[in-house]
Amino acid sequence: MKLDVNKQYSGFVIRQAAYIDEIQSEAYVMEHTYSGARLLYLGNNDDNKVFSISFRTPPYDDTGVAHILEHSVLCGSRKYRLKEPFVELVKGSMNTFLNAMTYPDKTMYPVASRNAKDFQNLMDVYLDAVFYPLIYENPYTLRQEGWHYNIEAPTDALSYNGVVYNEMKGVFSSADALLDYEAMKALFPDTPYSFESGGHPDAIPELTQEAFEHFHTTYYSPENSFIYLYGDMEIETTLQYLNDEYLSGFKRTGAVNSEIPLQNAFARTQEVLGTYPVGADEATEDKTYHELHIVTGDARDVKTSMALRVLESVLLEGNSAPLRLALLQSGVAKDISGSYAGSYRQPIFSIKAAGSKPEQRDKFISIIYHTLQQLTINGIDRELLEAHLNYLEFKLREADFGAYPKGLIYGISVMDSWLYDGDPLAGLRYTEALQQLREGIKTRYYEQLIENYLLDNTHKVIVTLNPEQGKEEREQEVLAEKMAVLKASMDTETIAQNIELCSELHKRQAAADTAEALETIPLLERSDIRREVEVTETVLKQLGTNDILYVPAFTNKIAYLNWYFDLTGIDKDLLPYCYLLSDVLGKFNTDKYTYQELATASNKYTGGVSFQMHAYSAADDANDYTIKFTVQAKALTANLDKLFDILQAVALGSKIDDAKRLQEILDEVNTDWDSSFFSRGQTVACTRLASYFSTAARVNEQDQFSYYEFLKELSADFAGRAEDTLAKLRQLLGIFFESSKYLLAYSCEESERMLVLEQALNFAALLPQSAVAGKTPQFLEAPGENEGIMTPGKVQYVAAGGDFHKFGYQFHGAMKVLETILRYEYLWTKIRVQGGAYGATARFDRNGTMFFASYRDPKLKESLQAYYDMPSWLEKLELSERELTKYIIGTISGLDTPLTNSMRLEQAGVYHLKQVDTAMRQQMRSEIIDLTNADLQKLAPLIRDTLSEKYLCVVGSSQSIEANKNIFTKTQHI
């Protein structure tokens, strides 16, 4: 139904109403007059409903109070007096999204669900949490989620522990986080942005209970809130609920002052010099970062923000970006990247050089200014501007956000203006702004943007971070000395008090919630779950030795193609070069395009073209696999001829003969690995672990730590290996694109099905036959066993696992429920709550692979012991019918995530390659829904036997790995 402007509904007055064509939604901006709460409702027929409540939460120090509070309000509330209602919701709701996020100036609490009853339950738990948390009566919440003194006996060393404390230790292990921290302090010295809202590990222990409570009292009130609703719902009923249950209990006071002030511009560019940690023996040459940050305009100016986003993309993203090219060709750095951060009161335009030298800073700045000045004089390439505008429009209209609900992303994006008292609808109405930006191509609009915001603007900071050997170890020593001095200053009584507090915290963490408390969390019934597996309609046909898989869908005139070319029989010694070729494809000149022209054409005519390699194991056997080179592409069907022209140029016309160009690409990939290695820690640990016992995983691991090592070795002797490497890449190019054995999976509208297929087959007809397609794979040897991979980080990623098929066990749907139980009960309690890690996961695959892994974990051997103790815990596990139902619902929720067109196509293709049929999926779903305690307990010996081989891999701090080196077969520094 439609709501009328200026009319009141359950205390809400409609201030603005409009239909937003771009997202096909009726939009209503409202105000709750009694409490002062703001509300935006986007009404449409999307059953994936979204609710969010956000608060403006500007930090006033580095203690991370906003972040810790975000964790803590979800640890029990007035109605839901459990230790962690949030976790109970994760365990047992049908949510399609459930999380909370701390930003530099706001905190958001969003939920989403397709089930109306479940959606109401989620909304109520979250509202009760933010307005009535138990933090005022339970000081142990701050100790658990924020920080506490960790000491269990008088002779123990004193240390800090806490979930957020350890999370932020992990965050600040990366150079990127340190760059951002230094930049924000310098860019906004007089505003809340100068503080780290997530918390700095050095400052988190300064947060007191009083300051913690004061922050909640100050900012968590309806008049400082932004409520967002999206989707198909009874809006009048929802408004009445919000008013009656929550908002009517809070009278607007006018006392909340959370406005984000503007930072005055500087008279001149500010300079910051700092260091970041690398290993004690790690080389430091070419590892300096330089980053120029420029404050640009006002977040509420949607057109300018969109234009600056396009300009950043034009200047700095892709192989045709002129500023990026100028910097790379000057040799100032090995990799150049840019970003536009529009979710600040004053957005930030950034240009980063990675893999540089300290003395290159002035040259970095000089080239930026010279290049920008030349662009304002000579003009930006109009085709380049058009290409990036086309790509932006494609992404906006496609609105494919992967597993994230569309309504969630809209809710986050409206905050870019709404949070600063701007129009929340402005960013959703992009058509007019896009048209104005297209008109700007005909004028000097973009050149004037460069002049006004990038050249003449003095609100800038240049940050330089140099690598410092052994910095992490020295900081740990300083912290240990500080803690020793602190403990020495404590009298016996104070030490005893801290031991008692630590002991009491552990008791509370280990204690189970009462049945009465658990039953306050609303729960669906098993009967609410759809028993039948959701089946994607597909049409499979064979053309000779090739398979064609069509997935019908409404795609808004977009064609999606996933092309899997068979490489199974490839020489195993060539596998590292296969992954390298996947990285360099499209980045060399071709017989028709320069690599810059190719990048422009791709942006102009497609929604993206990507290349990757992967080994797909059969559903029930990790050692029966095929290797596929995959091309993923999408384009408007009107541009299909352009898409295949691009693919033909890459497949048949790539000139892989330029050693200098290969060196440039290698430098970029190497530098990216260096800067992101620690953030990839869990993936590195888990893929390396799986490679110890799975031949398919050994192939895929060639794209992880083995690839990192391969790149380093190749770069170290590039002059001696360049020609051989180029020759191997040319050889592989003739094998990658082949017509002997492939799977073409594609999706488009039925009316365009034959058009898409005809053009695809015309392209395939040009491709050569292959000598490796359809052959038996050459098995790789395991790269090692039980490795400790040492980084300059402060925390660990601890993985252990094995192959349960080896011991005669078969996959069962109960394993997927056990994943949920372990992630959010056993491992959550042992690894996160008691151990202080940010998180932990569990995985059981049909192919026999099983692993457990922790994330940003301050512990090492304790986490391994938790894995080894798991079977004994599981043998004694007796869940009530309600608890079983809860975990079943939570598991099904993960399986029933709504799929976008591209996700549905990929799923169909992978199921085909892995030989997963509907009957297998239905059997698993039935086993999940019909789960019993006995099914779970049967898995205890499976875990015990599989872990008995003691396969493990740890990525983390050198100190922790050195202290536990006896458990490793091999340790090494990155």
Task: Give a label for each model feature.
Residues 2-5, 76, 131-134, 138-177, ...:
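Non-catalytic accessory/assembly modules
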Residues 2-29, 529-539:
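Short, Gly/Pro- and small/polar-rich lid/capping loops
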Residues 2-3, 231, 388-544, 548-552, ...:
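C-terminal regions of mature proteins
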Residues 40-45, 52-54, 165, 169-173, ...:
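His/Glu-based metal-binding/catalytic segments typifying zinc-dependent metallopeptidases
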Residues 94-96, 291-296, 316-355, 413, ...:
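A structural supersecondary motif
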Residues 2-7, 76-78, 85-214, 306-309, ...:
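Acidic/histidine-enriched segments that form metal/cofactor-coordinating
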